Amino acid sequence: MRVYFLDTSALVKRYHQERGSKEIDALFTEQDRRIIISDLSIIELGSALAKKVREGEITVDKYHRAIGFFCQDVVTENIQVETLGEADKVAAAALLETHGLRTNLRTLDSLQLAMMKRLSETQLDQVLCADQTFCSIIQREGLVVRNPEEDRLS
C-alpha cells in the first residue's frame, strides 16, 4: 500500500480545479493507497477556499460544496486525518530554528513538516506539496516530495 501525505497546498487541488488537480485526482483513484493530512489542514483548507471566494475565483456556493466534498472524503475515510501532538510542536520549533533562519519556513508549514517527519519513520512513502519553497525544505529533511504542478505522480 502506498501512503501519501498531502500538504494543504496540494490538498486544495482536490476541491478546486487548478494546475496540478489532475495529478491529485489520480491519487484518489489508486486502489491500494492511503492519503493522510494533518488536522491543521482542515483549517488551512477552509482558509484557502475562503480566500478564493474573497478574490472572486469561486462563489460562496462553490465554497460550501467544496467543504462538503472534503467532509465526505474524511467521513468515508478517503482521507485519514492525523492529529498534531505536543511532540510535533516541539519538533516544529526546532525545524523553525534549523530552516527559518535561512529560508522562509512558515509557522504552519513547520507544524506540517514535523508531522511529515514523524509519519515518515513508520508509514509514509511520499509527500505531495505545491509550494516549491516548502518542497525544497521538505526534501532537505530527507523526505520524498513531489509537486503536482510540476511532476507526474504516477
Briefly describe each language-model feature range.
Residues 1-3, 118-154:
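Acidic, PIN/NYN-like endoribonuclease modules and their adjacent C-terminal/linker elements
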Residues 22, 47, 90, 135-136:
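Alpha-helical elements of the RecA-like P-loop NTPase motor core of helicases
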Residues 51-86:
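Helix-adjacent hinge/juxtasegments
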Residues 79-130:
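Active-site neighborhoods of divalent-metal-dependent phosphate/nucleic-acid chemistry enzymes
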